[in-house]
Amino acid sequence: MNAPKPVVLCILDGWGLSDDKTANAPYLAKTPTFDAIMTKGPHARLITHGPDVGLPSGQMGNSEVGHTNIGAGRVVAMDLGQIDLAIEDGSFFDNAALRDFIARTRAAGGTAHLMGLVSDGGVHGHLNHIIAAAQAITNAGVPVVMHAITDGRDVAPKSAYGFMAELEDRLPKGARIVTVTGRYFALDRDNRWERVQEAYDAMVRGEGRRVSTAHSAIDYAYNQSESDEFITASVLTGYDGMRDGDSLFCLNFRADRAREILRAIGEPGFADFDTGARPALSALLGMVEYSDAHNAYMTTVFPKRDIVNTLGAWVARHGLRQFRLAETEKYPHVTFFLNGGKEEAEPGEDRFMPKSPKVATYDMQPEMSAPEVTDKFVEAIGAGYDLIVTNYANPDMVGHTGDLKAAIKACEAVDQGLSRVIAALEQAGGAMIVTADHGNCEMMIDPETGGPHTAHTLNPVPVALVGGPAGVTLRDGRLSDLAPTVLALMGLPKPPEMTGESLIT
């Protein structure tokens, strides 16, 4: 039997499965196409958290982890666990890059600036890592100031008081908090430079909303109806910015949301907004590598590990053509992360990236750019590609707003797109795996607080096969089983590095 063409992997980002229907956007939405996929064809469930995706037990998955595991076809040990272990066994404190950072700062007579997400969400960073870094640096006699980025997205929307109190309690002598900024500003990833500039001005220039303490920054924000994610850049009394000879250590271990603020601080010739005269920093260090471009002006504590023979690399090695599609919010996931942290496209790999809508939050436009994604998706199905990988961002990005009605609309927008995609797929004679990278919008109300739930979940995600071989079924599995399944549909062997197994039975 001939292999179907194209073979499609469609990722509904943040679309989880839950038996609790109370605030379950996919369940409450009118999704006739998805419902038909899950009732008429082969379907199963995938685990997206904890050791099954290379994370510590109980740690929720996320889009970076999910797409990395999907593309690798094997369980990839993620940075969170590696960093935790290095702190636990003491090797973090002896790391050569960290020691060099300390030596350069001390030689310049500077202050070490730490920047990181202050929560235990474990998606972009972790409070424990901030404390370890502060201890290592202050133990060497170098003063430390902390640029605290509040979360409210991977943890409860108004949990900053507790995390800030823990940070203040655990910071060693010689370290203090000097700015408090919501991640909406400091961790943008969609070229909203006006947001990034607010964070930059506070951290680098010491300009922003003036407050006396970190807690008063949160107080003021809550009085202005700003939840943690949206806290206006606030500068504590006595801080007036970075100086020549100072240094910066970014503690975030996920690349996509750290890139823009680091570019503004360190990239030679940066011109996306007026930074003013930037200080001559003695050192710029990252917990991980953020991109090849960042490597030109930063060092790293944990260099990138090569993931060889990813799905994309293996398909390219067999001389086949592939297409990657997502709007800008999720574009790095179907390219950089799916390709194992590699920026460049594989030979024969084409890409398209519709711009995400320019709105303050995506509950204001829950359809996002799904119509344009679908237009290009349908076009690609008829264009002769062997493999197509598409990500619909809506369930995750709107799920993060905590707005149930908007999340329902987001799911419905995706379902409308799926209807058109399946029609095109049937006409072309292709096959498609529909799945998700983690849960989110199936839990829009926090069961503990009764308030909005904005974080990812530990729930399983769907996996379904459309247009596959007759009579097959799918088994339950994990994300690393998806690439071997795709290769099986394409009639290709899997590379020896892929330890995942095809879901088709």
UniProtKB/Swiss-Prot annotation:
The active site is at S63 (phosphoserine intermediate). Binds 2 manganese ions per subunit. The keyword Electron transport does not apply. Pathway: Carbohydrate degradation; glycolysis; pyruvate from D-glyceraldehyde 3-phosphate: step 3/5. Mn(2+) 2 binds at D13, S63, D437, H438. Keywords: Glycolysis, Isomerase, Manganese, Metal-binding. Substrate binds at H124, R153, D154, R183, R189, R254, A255, D256, R257, K330. It catalyses: (2R)-2-phosphoglycerate = (2R)-3-phosphoglycerate. Its cofactor is Mn(2+). Mn(2+) 1 binds at D396, H400, H456. It comes from the Bacteria. It is an enzyme of class 5 (isomerase). Gene3D superfamilies: Alkaline Phosphatase, subunit A (3.40.720.10), BPG-independent phosphoglycerate mutase, domain B (3.40.1450.10). GO terms for cellular component: cytosol. GO terms for molecular function: manganese ion binding; phosphoglycerate mutase activity. Its EC number is 5.4.2.12. One of its GO terms (biological process) is glucose catabolic process. InterPro entries: Alkaline_phosphatase_core_sf, BPG-indep_PGM_N, Metalloenzyme, PGAM_B_sf, Pgm_bpd_ind. Catalyzes the interconversion of 2-phosphoglycerate and 3-phosphoglycerate. Belongs to the BPG-independent phosphoglycerate mutase family. Monomer. This is 2,3-bisphosphoglycerate-independent phosphoglycerate mutase. It comes from Ruegeria pomeroyi (strain ATCC 700808 / DSM 15171 / DSS-3). The lineage of its organism: Bacteria, Pseudomonadati, Pseudomonadota, Alphaproteobacteria, Rhodobacterales. The gene is gpmI.
